[in-house]
Amino acid sequence: MLDRSQFATNLLMCTVTRLKACVREIDTVARFGGDEFVVLLDELALSLEDSMAQAAVVAEKIRLALAAPYVLGLQRGGADALAVEHRCTASIGVTLFVHGEASQDDILVRADAAMYQAKEQGRNRVFF
């Protein structure tokens, strides 16, 4: 029998690795809860148009990275017993803000609303 918690843990660890590979060192990747993550991009362009373009490039890079197949090794009795291929999609909500413009909670609410718009439009997409 497969250990589902081990599978979930392995998947989350691989997801974090992929997310971190898509952003710069100055950016932040954090697990928000369950299967939700927050990515904060720092020092984007000053103009709204350029910032949106930069964020869109990173969001699409993340979407594609997360869509690639995961091959997860699972153990039984302490030894690798099985490799499972798994595929995920990502619905990504993006919001732009200037430091100090809104509370942390307000920013997360806006990003969450954008994510649900992405899901409503068919999942596996980016929405601003």
Please report, for each region that a protein language model flagged, where it lies by residue.
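A short glycine-centered flexible hinge/capping loop motif at secondary-structure junctions
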Residues: M1-A8, G33-G34, G122-R123
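PAS and PAS-like sensory/regulatory domains
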Residues: H86-S91
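Residue-level recognition of strand-loop junctions within catalytic nucleotide-signaling folds
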Residues: L40-A45, A67, F97-V98
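Active-site loop/short helix in cyclic nucleotide turnover domains
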Residues: M1-F7, V23-R24, L40-A45
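Catalytic-core segments of nucleotide cyclases and related cyclic-nucleotide turnover enzymes
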Residues: E49-A56, L82-A83, F97-R123, F127
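A short pre-motif secondary-structure segment
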Residues: T28-R31
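Alpha-helical scaffold within the catalytic cores of cyclic-nucleotide enzymes
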Residues: T15-K20, S51-D80, D112
